[in-house]
Design a protein with these regions (language model features):
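Short acidic capping loops at alpha-helix termini that bridge into adjacent secondary structure
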Residues: 82, 112-116, 168-173
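Helix N-cap/beta->alpha junction signal
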Residues: 64, 94, 150-151
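An alpha-beta-alpha
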Residues: 69-110, 220-230
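Alpha-helical recognition/docking segments in bacterial nutrient-uptake
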Residues: 1-73, 138
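Flexible loop/turn connectors
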Residues: 130-230
């Protein structure tokens, strides 16, 4: 669908674009569209992520690695030692959040165990997460906590745990990421990482307007990194 929307924007002769990449950890399929916008001197700004080989383009992003580090460090400081992780494999946010997970484990003297990590794709998130939770908690060495890619996954994990007669947070601690409305609507009070969505949008809009007013907009790549907090 990204190619369809990019074509629509191209046909409408827009003056600038804010783009949230899809499957950003994979090689981009629509480089020809981005090149076409550049040839037309139309600036674009990536938000939330970027594509491989396009790291030099203007972008506004959250420090996903730092955010997940904070979540896992929080669990470790609460005495959790068997911390599972669930991450999305086909976007750059998932890859960087996994890096933060690994770094926090190491920082707290906890060995990384790949058997405690569940990976999912956009298309199979519920299937993979359900299977992963059942496998993790069906073993004799159950995790004492789960750090999730985002709040949506965390709420799904809580549902699966409840179906297995495991209470959150009494039996298992679960953390999310995004501080979305789902965090407050979860059965358990979900600890989550605040995602500054409004700030991201403001910075992206300001950046694209500044680029529109420049003489050479596509020659001026820059990045704005927004911090997170528990």
């Amino acid at each position: 669908k990204e190619s369809q929307y990019l074509q629509e924007m191209f046909d409408k002769n827009v003056e600038g674009l804010i783009i949230e990449p899809t499957k950003s950890s994979l090689v981009p399929k629509n480089l020809s569209y981005f090149k076409a916008f550049e040839n037309r001197r139309v600036p674009y700004v990536f938000i939330h992520g970027w594509y491989e080989k396009m790291e030099d383009k203007p972008m506004v992003i959250v420090d996903d690695e730092k955010g997940m580090f904070e979540a896992v460090d929080y669990l470790a400081k609460k005495g959790k030692r068997k911390i599972a992780g669930i991450f999305k494999v086909d976007d750059i946010q998932g890859i960087n959040r996994h890096k933060g997970y690994v770094k926090a484990l190491m920082n707290n003297g906890i060995a990384y165990d790949p058997d405690l990590v569940v990976w999912f794709h956009s298309e199979d998130k519920y299937l993979k997460c359900s299977y992963g939770v059942q496998k993790l908690f069906g073993s004799s060495q159950k995790p004492d906590s789960v750090a999730c890619y985002n709040d949506e996954i965390a709420v799904w994990v809580i549902k699966e745990l409840n179906d297995m007669n495991l209470a959150v947070p009494q039996d298992v601690s679960v953390t999310g990421f995004d501080d979305s409305f789902l965090a407050s609507s979860a059965v358990a009070n979900l600890t989550t990482i605040k995602h500054p969505k409004d700030l991201l949008g403001e910075h992206a809009a300001r950046m694209v307007l500044e680029l529109i007013n420049e003489q050479d907009p596509v020659e001026n790549g820059s990045a704005k990194d927004i911090s997170t907090k528990v």
